[in-house]
Amino acid sequence: MNANLFGIKGLSLIISSVMLFFVFGCASAPKEFDAKITGPQLIVEPDTITLGVANLLKKPIIFKGKGFKPGDSVFVSLLGVEKGGQKMDIALADAEVDQAGGFVAGVPTLSKITELLRADMGSNAKMENIVIVSKPPIPAGTYTARAVSMESNLKAETPFCIKGPSVGDSIKDWLGGLAGKIVKK
């Protein structure tokens, strides 16, 4: 009996180790600016997202830039997104450029819901915010994110990969539906 129990514990340890490797070993390293470039630069963290509702709403998407004119305003857009049969740019974030020429722009929840998920916000009977999904999200693919400053018209671009919902995302969204936080129509 003890030998069989040890075998199960050993197998559990191996499976746990493999799972931890997949979770932590496959994560990409934090993005850094290229020291060789003197002009405007843009990076995004994470550089890949999935379109699961629950996962996307909890995950911060941060655009960082440097090499812009201090005191300027910067707007970050996703280029070439198919919407209504046409390709168009969608606004995701904005920020003020600091005195060092850098900025940090987080994508707000409303932009994630309306632009990336193409969903709506509403309220449930408890007056809690809910996400109402009635259309498919933007198509999966690798897009270009562009930061443009308003006064100086400086520009910088970075790739931004958007993937469809994973199996884990689907499970989280199903649980969100059971909790009344995600409504699919």
Where are these regions (language model features)?
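Sec-dependent bacterial lipoprotein signal peptides
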Residues: 1-26
